[in-house]
Amino acid sequence: MTTAIGKKTTKLEPFKMERGVKYRDAAKTSVIQVRNIDPDQELLKKPEWMKIKLPTNSAKIDSIKYGMRRHGLHSVCEEASCPNLHECFNHGTATFMIMGAICTRRCPFCDVAHGKPLPLDPYEPRKVAETVQDMKLKYVVITSVDRDDLADRGAAHFAATVREIKALNPECKVEILVPDFRGRVEQAVAILKQNPPDVFNHNLENVPRLYREIRPGADYKWSLELLKIFKQEFPNIPTKSGLMVGLGETNEEILAVMQDLRDHGVTMLTVGQYLQPSRHHLRVERYVPPAEFEMFRSEAEKMGFEHAACGPFVRSSYHADLQAKGELVK
């Protein structure tokens, strides 16, 4: 087949997905052909500022992984191939990914597996709480795959997880990084009202012009509405959102999205560089230099964001505890 930009790609035959099987890379993008991905494309060379020095001691990393495995839990750090895994695990922090490791969406920027997920584990909220207790965490981030197969899109499971963590760890602060609860926004917020988090996070990811390409199945206005409705219900709880750059957007478009976030009551922001997980994902169109991230941070301050973490390796949950305290993260 030929893509919209005229490059030839290998046609992959459609197949029937099996429940509980993780589909990644070519298998993931062949479920519905992603026309703007060419696995034979020439990749941009990483600049010096994008190179990571790995730690020599992995004891802390192994300890975090063991704690996850022991309770049958998942971290988005591993499932999404986050470049900060070694730094965060060595710092003693991890972001728990609940509701399994199989997503019902197939966003071509994301390395989380796609497929037909298994039923929810009703004991998972308690397992997360016990792991938080074992690891003596004072700040924890809970995120999830998209679960469009669930009537409430997983809102009750989020609420149960917050409740169990608080019950076992009353001093622990909980940030939730939620999906868009497609078509169930008001229902989801009503459910979360029973056990609200300390920080509410939902990522817009990029600019509306590129949404069909980057976030198939999502809607820019829905995501803004979710952030707005939550803030209206919980005016004293910080709301947060994250953006990736380097996917073909302009700086002016990113600044416009930042203003949209402020107009919808969002008080915390993260902006980081998109990194291509494999040749079967969206290509990095450019590496944004550190000076431009500093510009985003400066403009965010002018717009009235209470905290903005902007830098090449910044991710939503990167040093989330420090972000919540208002400390500089970049």
Swiss-Prot record:
PANTHER family membership: LIPOYL SYNTHASE, LIPOYL SYNTHASE, MITOCHONDRIAL
Pathway: Protein modification; protein lipoylation via endogenous pathway; protein N(6)-(lipoyl)lysine from octanoyl-[acyl-carrier-protein]: step 2/2
CDD domains assigned: Radical_SAM
Chain's gene name: lipA
InterPro entries: Aldolase_TIM (IPR013785), Elp3/MiaA/NifB-like_rSAM (IPR006638), Lipoyl_synth (IPR003698), rSAM (IPR007197)
Catalytic activity as recorded in UniProt: [[Fe-S] cluster scaffold protein carrying a second [4Fe-4S](2+) cluster] + N(6)-octanoyl-L-lysyl-[protein] + 2 oxidized [2Fe-2S]-[ferredoxin] + 2 S-adenosyl-L-methionine + 4 H(+) = [[Fe-S] cluster scaffold protein] + N(6)-[(R)-dihydrolipoyl]-L-lysyl-[protein] + 4 Fe(3+) + 2 hydrogen sulfide + 2 5'-deoxyadenosine + 2 L-methionine + 2 reduced [2Fe-2S]-[ferredoxin]
Chain ranges of the Radical SAM core domain: 89-306
Chief place where the protein resides: cytoplasm
Lineage: Bacteria, Pseudomonadati, Pseudomonadota, Gammaproteobacteria, Pasteurellales
Gene Ontology CC entries for this record: cytoplasm
Gene3D superfamilies registered for this protein in UniProt: Aldolase class I
Annotated compartments: Cytoplasm
Organism whose genome encodes this protein: Haemophilus ducreyi (strain 35000HP / ATCC 700724)
EC numbers: 2.8.1.8
Name of the protein: Lipoyl synthase
Family, per entry: Belongs to the radical SAM superfamily. Lipoyl synthase family.
